[in-house]
Amino acid sequence: MASAKIKKGDSVVVLSGKDKGKTGTVAKVMPKEGKVVVEGVNMIARHRKPSQENPQGGIDRYEAPMHIAKVAVADPKDGKPTRVRIEEKDGKKVRVAVKSGETIDG
């Protein structure tokens, strides 16, 4: 799989699925699986039975990984989804939003 242009800490917009349109910050990138974990998006509930460590039991809610193609980097200018281009500025490679031309990092 090609290297992802989405990095940990990026602000992203969900493009499809039950959370379409939501924005969040990337908590984890899994390039080998082609998935990302976005804070507050794609929440799942895990029902836990009471055990020795957790005598109460209960429901744990956490973010599940989602396919990297379902998210796009949010444009720093207006927050809408944009593609990312890599340019060289001052001898360093930086990521640039295609829509606005703003640098995402660097």
Curated annotation (Swiss-Prot):
Q: What is this protein called?
A: Large ribosomal subunit protein uL24
Q: How does it assemble?
A: Part of the 50S ribosomal subunit.
Q: Does the keyword Protein biosynthesis apply?
A: no
Q: What is one Gene Ontology biological process annotated in the Swiss-Prot or TrEMBL record?
A: translation
Tell me yes or no: is RNA-binding among this UniProt entry's keywords. yes
List the gene name: rplX
The similarity comment for this entry is: Belongs to the universal ribosomal protein uL24 family.
What is this protein's function?
A: One of two assembly initiator proteins, it binds directly to the 5'-end of the 23S rRNA, where it nucleates assembly of the 50S subunit. One of the proteins that surrounds the polypeptide exit tunnel on the outside of the subunit.
UniProtKB keywords? Ribonucleoprotein, Ribosomal protein, RNA-binding, rRNA-binding
Molecular function, one GO term? structural constituent of ribosome
One GO cellular component this record assigns the protein to is: ribonucleoprotein complex
Taxonomy of origin reads: Bacteria, Pseudomonadati, Pseudomonadota, Alphaproteobacteria, Sphingomonadales
Q: Which organism is it from?
A: Erythrobacter litoralis (strain HTCC2594)
The family database entries (Pfam families) matched by this protein are listed as: KOW, ribosomal_L24
